[in-house]
């Protein structure tokens, strides 16, 4: 399967957008694997006093397992990435990173409550929230909520999340490149990424919690559309996001059938 996506996030710090190309393979009904590469387009707000940047991010690979059960559905994935992005632009931590994620859910008619928990050495981006920074340091991440099936192609997700780091943390800004001074004045609401390119500190530096809302629409089998909102409580940051995804294998496979 070949998949192309374009995602963006906008808040008071500016806009972060990602064009991602990926390829995946399903070995059977339970196991799959994939690789991909993102390209970032970052446009900081005028308050940071910095210019827009762009470039390739970290190449990543994922292995995934999924098991459906009448009692409880479970999926797990392990993603690793190499430091191919430019850390001076905030496109990489300069280190190899991993993320182990686990998800449990159960269908109750139109409601599908879920719990998502994982461990990583870098805060993972989500479809709701492309953070204006990347991080390096061990952490656990949690999300719980429910998917609501509004129709056969429209769904709403409501959830809360928590980022729980431990030990030394390094925060690398995507809106203040290396060599730039960033926002003048002191750090507000813990947003060190507005003032300097790189900050190292304790777990409180990257600790975060908040709420998400996401509306997903799939008008065609090969087309996925998303519109999301995130409120970061720790950083007092409101973000609006969008996503457009195209399953190229499904799209071109359908076109071949039409030609025949």
Question: Model-derived features: where do they sit?
Answer:
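Surface-exposed loop and membrane-interface regions of Gram-negative outer-membrane beta-barrel proteins
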Residues: 33-64, 168
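Strand-connecting loop/turn motifs
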Residues: 26-30, 69-73, 108-112, 149-153, ...
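Outer membrane beta-barrel transmembrane domains
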Residues: 136, 141, 145-260
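Short glycine/proline- and aromatic-enriched beta-strand/turn motifs that initiate or cap beta-hairpins
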Residues: 1-25
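Transmembrane beta-strands of outer-membrane beta-barrel pores
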Residues: 1-7, 37-43, 67, 80-86, ...
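Residues that define the transmembrane beta-barrel architecture of outer-membrane proteins
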Residues: 13-19, 53-59, 92-98, 134-142, ...
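Extracellular loop and loop/strand-boundary signature of outer-membrane beta-barrel proteins
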Residues: 6-9, 45-51, 85-90, 127-133, ...
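Residues on the lipid-exposed face of transmembrane beta-strands in outer-membrane beta-barrel proteins
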Residues: 21-25, 35, 61-65, 78, ...
